[in-house]
Design a protein with these regions (language model features):
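P-loop/Walker-type NTP enzyme "switch/lid" segment
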Residues: 1-44, 135
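Glycine-rich phosphate-binding loop used to anchor ATP phosphates in small-molecule kinases
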Residues: 38-57
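Short, conserved loop/helix-junction motifs that constitute active-site signature segments
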Residues: 63, 85-90, 113-117
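Short, hydrophobic alpha-helical segments
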Residues: 157-168
Length: 169
């Protein structure tokens, strides 16, 4: 089937997260899974939604990442956090939920473009199709393959591929 295959990890509450982080067996299982999966499927892209500075369980996965995307929304809270963040060499900022009709979004984005932040040139716009797909419990591509967000995700993939290939070669 064409499109993206998604394996959702789900939401882990704080108590379970602490238990997972403290469990040596959980760490071993995750490391084994990651190693086995990447050996069996070396050309597969794996996207992980993590908070690496707060998540010791996946810290080694983040260290092995070819590309790290720090997802942000053009707003004051994110602006403050970006200015406090130290970026890794393989880390880029991905603007998410951008609304072209929002003056504040335009102002922050324009200001960020003049900064030294390592920006991904693709920005993901706010798209109602995503909310509708979630409500329908369908992947976005299956729900509405021709929506703007699917096109932007494809563009993001096209931008990431040369970076991945240059790091492999």
């Amino acid at each position: 089937q064409n499109g993206y295959q998604i394996l959702p990890f789900g939401v882990v509450n704080s108590e379970d997260k602490l238990h997972l982080q403290a469990s040596a067996a959980a760490n071993q299982h995750l490391q084994h899974f990651f190693t086995t999966f990447t050996q069996q499927y070396p050309d597969t892209l794996i996207f992980l939604d993590l908070q690496p500075e707060h998540d010791t369980l996946f810290k080694s996965w983040v260290a092995k990442a070819n590309i790290v995307l720090t997802v942000t929304t053009p707003e004051s809270n994110c602006h403050i956090r970006l200015n406090q963040h130290t970026f890794a060499a393989n880390e880029y900022i991905l603007v998410n939920q951008f609304c072209a009709t929002s003056q504040i979004h335009q102002d922050f984005y324009q200001f960020w473009q003049t900064s030294q932040f390592p920006f991904c040139p693709i920005k993901l716009h706010r798209d109602e199709a995503l909310l509708e797909a979630c409500a329908s419990r369908l992947p976005l591509y299956d729900y509405r393959a021709n929506c703007m967000l699917v096109e932007e995700i494809n563009q993001l993939l096209q931008w990431c591929l040369p970076l991945l290939l240059s790091k492999k070669g």
